[in-house]
Amino acid sequence: MPINKYKAAVVTSEPVWENLEGGVVKTIEFINEAGKAGCKLIAFPEVWIPGYPYWMWKVNYLQSLPMLKAYRENSIAMDSSEMRRIRAAARDNQIYVSIGVSEIDHATLYLTQVLISPLGDVINHRRKIKPTHVEKLVYGDGSGDSFEPVTQTEIGRLGQLNCWENMNPFLKSLAVARGEQIHVAAWPVYPDLSKQVHPDPATNYADPASDLVTPAYAIETGTWVLAPFQRISVEGLKRHTPPGVEPETDATPYNGHARIFRPDGSLYAKPAVDFDGLMYVDIDLNESHLTKALADFAGHYMRPDLIRLLVDTRRKELVTEVGGGDNGGIQSYSTMARLGLDRPLEEEDYRQGTDAGETEKASSNGHA
């Protein structure tokens, strides 16, 4: 039975930097908190685990190497006990979980968003299709079968995009065409315009993301938009500063950027600069009726006979096998299946109460 009215939570908090176990524990704590508050959905920021590597915007190659190694060591594999513990928390709290992680698959990292159902099943696994600027030094590109933004759920057609994907007109068009009703615009951590240094464009700062890009998404798509944002402390700034470089001493410009917008683009909620925790929203999907009546770019307000979007959702792999089918064609497979995300949770294992030491047995799964 579809649920049109429900409570949701948006995370605006500091990650546990480069600490996989600490990140999992904090994630489960927030899921528990949202569950106790009666939420049907909780939305986490981009690469919440193990935090956004903001240092990559500030260091040279040699300075980056020890930081990159630590970051890779604390990224999460999809078929790991850590991920199953998060899935179990979603199941135990009967809540949808949209979470951004640094995923390690073989030897490559991806900016990944996972959508977990109240049954603990992974119902969407998507990878950012193109890391932004210096992010290309850390992460790889998503593939055809891992960029679908929208999933049909009992709480509506729920979409997810990472960071600057939220201003990509083609990805927005795809989400609109899928009939998106509620959107998670997951953001990392970066400063506001008070830290702007010429000639760096204003595009590269947090307040345009929060107060221009995110409400524009709501207006253009007619959806509820939840925009979780990471926070950072002075101690966190030190962690993102290489040895021999003077760290910043004021974290204020980096904080207070999470937002919630209604389907007409009006602001529902924003946090105080010093707020760390969960922001709550009472979603009513029926609010989008009038915005969609005015402008439905997947329906009455579009001309597909004139403008169309070509989408290729096939997996492209380095090694491609031919044969095996009735027509001897090229074999294909699902990334989700290869990663084990199509397997249900085992009832006897990976409960929230699993001893932390037990998590070691699968924590290296998929790591280089």
UniProtKB/Swiss-Prot annotation:
Region (Disordered): 341-368
Keywords recorded for this protein, A-Z: Hydrolase, Lyase
Keyword Hydrolase: yes
Temperature dependence: Optimum temperature is 42-55 degrees Celsius.
InterPro entries on file: C-N_Hydrolase (IPR003010), C-N_Hydrolase_sf (IPR036526), CN_hydrolase (IPR037544), Nitrilase/CN_hydratase_CS (IPR000132), Nitrilases_CHs (IPR044149)
PROSITE patterns the record matches: CN_HYDROLASE, NITRIL_CHT_1, NITRIL_CHT_2
CDD domains to which the protein is assigned, alphabetical: nitrilases_CHs
Quaternary context: Oligomer of dimers, forming left-handed helical fibers.
The protein, known as: Cyanide hydratase
Native species: Microdochium sorghi (Zonate leaf spot disease fungus)
